[in-house]
């Protein structure tokens, strides 16, 4: 919608800069085991699409970036910070035996996993409030047959946090807990850590430009400021390299990531979202791209290049 508005109005010819519109897949880093298999096969390097775009060099000549995310309710908003994370694929290996006739001859990998999860819960009181830690594992395989002692149990989890040092501190505690489960019953455990997403830090000057347009379109009473959110996005990796923003547009009902989530106000979610992005692009690139250049000039990147960014993930994971 934003692309059509800028193009068919002819305003794009009056702007001092180029605008690229990307459709980037895989913003949600679910299906950890499947994506791990793609990484193992060399088909991808990261869980998220925007990280992959960075690694492939598509961001090398981009100065600023923005995306917009749907949200429940009638309100829109700009965001400041949110969590980053690392992902874990956990494989407990036990020994099969007849679950009724000779369970003492087996090693129950499900018991190992359950103890590991309980040990994670015992660590929660050690997570600092300011780190906004979230750990939410799921068991993706609990065994094969009900009458066989489980010998193959698999767990996926994220360890989220506001800063990467906080994430890594919590991650070490989670690993100890998972290893304790295996030790308790004599099982083996393999923990594979996969780069997740960097924490988001929306550029404030950029946010201000976007917020003014939201005020015009929906009224300031419908514009919120979302701060220190526990959720994550692969856009955080973009925001560590170039000035970028990840605002929210209302128009949905239901819970985020829930089966009842659906569009309730198409006008707000589709049309207003497109207008807000197009208006912001005009504000950035009008008058010799004065505002865009100011934002770029004042931006302090976490990583100054793609190479520095990739090296940082490599160091964090080893």
Predicted regions span which residues?
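DPxDG-like acidic metal-binding loop motif
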Residues: 1-4
